[in-house]
């Protein structure tokens, strides 16, 4: 039997997965603009393959692709009546790939409906989350992730709804171009408020790359020293004056040249561990190569992963499928060594 997320976190850092919607858009399965996840219904094999890539890279958690799978958001693409089918399919695909190797997280996301002064809007958000959770929990997710909340108030509703399921709850906020929530709360204030509301894991995700989340994460760590801390940054470079990648003119179609290298994401994972982050994952732009390097520095590479080690004593032909005589190559290597 798999250990639950809280048990695993007590044993040390847990490695999450990467981004789904932008990567699937690049592959031709998700529409830019709405970024809704109907791929779980229309092209389940494409989603299954991406889950497999993250699993094989070393991810210990797979998130069901239910981000933006709420009724109102799906209505923007005429799929409001497929909410249950979509949420159910997304969880089943993730669980099938996860098997006994990974945990599966249900997912709630920002709704674009939250209004801080409107009780009716808050009730609508609450009903939206409850509707998705009923399906996801019924399909057997291991815990709930609520993410990408710029409004702390909306994040608190996610905590409230998710806690009623009885499952562990992780909720992360996102900062746009200021180090504040939409209400003007600091990272420390947000983290403490979420923990006090019952969140088991708190932190930050999306919008910003690693370099622009470390400071607020350190503030969170100081504010909630006994809580589990999560980080899931994007894998794109952004300038200091515009850390939110969605505010850049390159979003969403010209982000390729801004993508972080696998080594940069490995450095992020190492730094995150050093400052006390417990759940180390990634978001938009992070693909399996990034997760694999993160797994490497966190010593979480799957046992079956083959590690290629550079050996400058060997010619490149030793690594490529060139048509050559192995004996001849060996003789040349011996001669080269003898000449030294």
Language-model segments: residues:
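Domain-level signal for soluble alpha/beta catalytic cores
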Residues: 1-340
């Amino acid at each position: 039997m798999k250990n639950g997320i809280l048990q695993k976190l007590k044993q040390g850092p847990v490695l999450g997965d990467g981004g789904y919607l932008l990567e699937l858009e690049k592959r031709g399965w998700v529409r830019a603009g709405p970024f809704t996840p109907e791929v779980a219904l229309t092209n389940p094999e494409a989603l299954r393959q991406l889950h497999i890539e993250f699993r094989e890279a070393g991810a210990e958690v797979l998130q069901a692709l239910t981000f933006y799978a709420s009724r109102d958001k799906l209505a923007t693409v005429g799929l409001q009546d497929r909410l249950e089918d979509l949420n159910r399919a997304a969880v089943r695909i993730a669980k099938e790939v996860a098997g006994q190797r990974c945990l599966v997280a249900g997912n709630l996301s920002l709704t674009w409906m939250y209004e801080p002064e409107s009780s009716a809007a808050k009730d609508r958000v609450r009903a939206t989350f409850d509707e998705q959770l009923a399906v996801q929990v019924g399909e057997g997710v291991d815990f709930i992730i609520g993410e990408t909340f710029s409004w702390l108030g909306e994040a608190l509703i996610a905590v409230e709804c998710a806690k009623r399921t009885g499952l562990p709850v992780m909720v992360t906020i996102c900062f746009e171009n200021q180090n504040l929530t939409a209400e003007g709360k600091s990272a420390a204030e947000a983290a403490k408020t979420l923990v006090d509301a019952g969140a088991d894991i708190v932190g930050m995700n999306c919008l910003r790359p690693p370099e622009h989340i470390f400071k607020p994460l350190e503030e969170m760590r100081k504010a909630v020293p006994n809580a589990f801390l999560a980080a899931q940054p994007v894998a794109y470079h952004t300038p200091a004056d515009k850390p939110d990648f969605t505010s850049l003119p390159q979003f969403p179609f010209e982000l390729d040249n801004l993508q972080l290298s696998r080594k940069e994401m490995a450095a992020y994972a190492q730094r995150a561990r050093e400052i006390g982050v417990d759940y180390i994952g990634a978001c938009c732009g992070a693909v399996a190569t990034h997760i694999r390097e993160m797994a490497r520095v966190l010593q979480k590479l799957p046992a079956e992963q083959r590690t290629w080690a550079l050996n400058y004593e060997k010619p490149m032909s030793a690594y490529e499928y060139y048509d050559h005589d192995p004996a001849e190559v060996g003789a040349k290597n011996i001669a080269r060594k003898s000449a030294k």
